[in-house]
C-alpha cells in the first residue's frame, strides 16, 4: 500500500488509438467504464486489444462502443465472447446528455482514445469529443511536428 501523502496514478494502457489525435481536433475528454464479460477482461489483461477503427455512438439514451476488437481468451472454453461485439459505456446521465447534445447540435464525433486499467484494476476507456480535421489541417500539423523535430535537433547540436 502506498504512503498516505503520495498520489499514485498508475495506468496500464492496453490499447491506444494513435491516429485519433491526428485525424480529429480533440475538444474534451471523458473517462468511461466498460460493461465487459470475464473473458474480455482476461483478454485485456494479456494486453491484446485494438480500438483503431472503433467509434462510439448514442442510442436510446446510452453510449455504445462499436467495432472495438478484443481477441478471444485462449484459455476459455466454449463460453468465450464475441470479438467485435457492441459494448456499453458507463457514464453519468449528465455526461451522456452533454455528449448527445454536442454530437446532435454541433456535429462532433465520439472517439475512443485508449483503454486502460486504473489504479483500482478497473477497465476504463478515455473517450474524446472531437471534430474531424480537414486535409490542410492535417498537413499543417505534420509540418509543425517536423519543424519542432528539426528545431530540437538544431538546439541539441548547439548545446
From Swiss-Prot:
PANTHER family: SSRA-BINDING PROTEIN, TMRNA-BINDING COMPONENT OF TRANS-TRANSLATION TAGGING COMPLEX. One of its GO terms (molecular function) is RNA binding. Signal peptide: none annotated. InterPro entries: SmpB (IPR023620), SsrA-bd_prot (IPR000037), SsrA-bd_prot_CS (IPR020081). Residues 134-159 are annotated as: Disordered. This is SsrA-binding protein. Required for rescue of stalled ribosomes mediated by trans-translation. Binds to transfer-messenger RNA (tmRNA), required for stable association of tmRNA with ribosomes. tmRNA and SmpB together mimic tRNA shape, replacing the anticodon stem-loop with SmpB. tmRNA is encoded by the ssrA gene; the 2 termini fold to resemble tRNA(Ala) and it encodes a 'tag peptide', a short internal open reading frame. During trans-translation Ala-aminoacylated tmRNA acts like a tRNA, entering the A-site of stalled ribosomes, displacing the stalled mRNA. Residues 137-159 have a biased composition (Basic and acidic residues). It is found in: Cytoplasm.
Amino acid at each position: 500500500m502506498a504512503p498516505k501523502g503520495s498520489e499514485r496514478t498508475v495506468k496500464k494502457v492496453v490499447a491506444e488509438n494513435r491516429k485519433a489525435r491526428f485525424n480529429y481536433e480533440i475538444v474534451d475528454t471523458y473517462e468511461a467504464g466498460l460493461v465487459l464479460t470475464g473473458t474480455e477482461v482476461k483478454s485485456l489483461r494479456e494486453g491484446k486489444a485494438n480500438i483503431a477503427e472503433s467509434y462510439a455512438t448514442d442510442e436510446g439514451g446510452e453510449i455504445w462502443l462499436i467495432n472495438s476488437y478484443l481477441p478471444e481468451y485462449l484459455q476459455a472454453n466454449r463460453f468465450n465472447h464475441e470479438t467485435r461485439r457492441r459494448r456499453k459505456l458507463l457514464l453519468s446521465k449528465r455526461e451522456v446528455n452533454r455528449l448527445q447534445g454536442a454530437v446532435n447540435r454541433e456535429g462532433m464525433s465520439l472517439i475512443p482514445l485508449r483503454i486502460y486499467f486504473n489504479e483500482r484494476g478497473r477497465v476504463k476507456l478515455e473517450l474524446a469529443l472531437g471534430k474531424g480535421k480537414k486535409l490542410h489541417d492535417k498537413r499543417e500539423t505534420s509540418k509543425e511536428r517536423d519543424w519542432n523535430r528539426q528545431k530540437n535537433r538544431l538546439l541539441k547540436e548547439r548545446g
